[in-house]
Amino acid sequence: MRQRILVVDDDASLAEMLTIVLRGEGFDTAVIGDGTQALTAVRELRPDLVLLDLMLPGMNGIDVCRVLRADSGVPIVMLTAKTDTVDVVLGLESGADDYIMKPFKPKELVARVRARLRRNDDEPAEMLSIADVEIDVPAHKVTRNGEQISLTPLEFDLLVALARKPRQVFTRDVLLEQVWGYRHPADTRLVNVHVQRLRAKVEKDPENPTVVLTVRGVGYKAGPP
């Protein structure tokens, strides 16, 4: 079955270009030009990924992202202008998985989309643990004391990457390559913001983490200390 991408952008020419590129790569696409309507479209179309512009009529992309994240783990990639530095951070904190700066090359966009859609349906049985958090990898399930912790697919991938090598300290660049699929230097804020989001969900006390630890000046590792 072809995967469906929802393009949320009020720039008709850009939306048309994205549709042509994505359909050429084998994806189904739908286009919405209004933020409020995008929320309805996600519920009705159940897309596999959302390409979300920050500046939208009706409701801006940051608010759309925040509302979607309240009850959906659908991957979200923001489309943003180079001047939107503050908004990029706000978007990531609101739940976006990645972002791409305009103007961008079609190949770069497709690579980001494919990286967020990667899933292996034939994963072997694998159980991991960090501190008191248990991870059932093929079931994409995280629990503490039998209670399930709801993570987005990207947050789950980040936790698994750390848990698989509990003694390794990961630099932000390494995590960008392993979790986001980047093959070139990129913005390490992606990692920092997602670690904060992950800690807010898996730590008993995010200010004193025992699951995802910071190694000052280097990066992150799995806990406990």
Swiss-Prot record:
Domain spans labelled Response regulatory: 4-117
Post-translational modification: Phosphorylated by MtrB.
GO molecular function: phosphorelay response regulator activity; transcription cis-regulatory region binding
Record-linked SUPFAM superfamilies: CheY-like (SSF52172)
GO biological process, one term: positive regulation of DNA-templated transcription
InterPro entries named in the record: CheY-like_superfamily, MtrA_REC, MtrAB_MtrA, OmpR/PhoB-type_DNA-bd, Sig_transdc_resp-reg_receiver, WalR-like, WH-like_DNA-bd_sf
A Pfam family per the record: Trans_reg_C
Keyword 4Fe-4S: no
A GO CC annotation given for this chain: cytosol
Its job: Member of the two-component regulatory system MtrA/MtrB.
Protein name: DNA-binding response regulator MtrA
Record organism: Mycolicibacterium paratuberculosis (strain ATCC BAA-968 / K-10) (Mycobacterium paratuberculosis)
